[in-house]
């Protein structure tokens, strides 16, 4: 594809030979001649000196240290994401039902649905138009799957789950399994509490590989529109998220906690149950959230605190050994003064 064609498809200006042939995309460090890369920030300019890329996507006003063909835009990373789609198309199953799939006669399939090898779809399921069900997926009874969804290999969708349009469920994810509900008995044992609720994924939700979203005991576990969930995340029963949240790998959210809109949970943070996290909250990696967080705050640490306070605490913590030595010296001096009657 020529440089001018790429610029036209992306709707951005370009500099350099309009007929320059581009056949792929790569990072600045790994690009080879004929490939397109991008530069998101000026601090990466040294990489531009060394790259073999034939063209780069850069910010509108960035001054380049050497002549190189380029595309310019306000958000180079977004343009690069769009450029990737010009050169790479993810695998799609052929439309139709593979002969090894087991489909209950009551299942309702929309137009252009693809169902791969060894898929099991149980009674009362409805699947929307152009949705793809990849190999070894199991869909339990009375599930609703919207249009243009992708359910990748080996994921499991439990009974009564509702999945909106344009959702991605990656390999190994489990949606709608029993919530973790157990009642202590007088003899010290535990009585399992049946989970009679369901999970709802609104439109445009993405669920990463080996993530689990448990169904509520009663009512719903609900993931808001456009929310993106990374791999290896555990979302407990009755959790509700607002729209367009971002939940990074290895996060755990205990039951009945509610997230507002546009909340970001960084990797390995944990949220206790029955909390309310306000709109726009950001939680730093490995933070332990133990109480409600007001809208707009950025928190870190365990237990969580405003990130500015946490940074000050960390600055002091690095000096604890020398502070301890100084304290011991002061204690020794005070003890000596007391022995000498204050002299």
Curated annotation (Swiss-Prot):
Enzyme class, spelled out: transferase
Coiled coil: none
One GO CC term, this protein: membrane
InterPro entries for this protein: Hexapep, LpxD, Trimer_LpxA-like_sf, UDP_GlcNAc_AcTrfase_non-rep
Catalysed transformations (reactions): a UDP-3-O-[(3R)-3-hydroxyacyl]-alpha-D-glucosamine + a (3R)-hydroxyacyl-[ACP] = a UDP-2-N,3-O-bis[(3R)-3-hydroxyacyl]-alpha-D-glucosamine + holo-[ACP] + H(+)
Role played: Catalyzes the N-acylation of UDP-3-O-acylglucosamine using 3-hydroxyacyl-ACP as the acyl donor. Is involved in the biosynthesis of lipid A, a phosphorylated glycolipid that anchors the lipopolysaccharide to the outer membrane of the cell.
Protein name per its UniProtKB record: UDP-3-O-acylglucosamine N-acyltransferase
Organism: Synechococcus sp. (strain JA-3-3Ab) (Cyanobacteria bacterium Yellowstone A-Prime)
Gene: lpxD
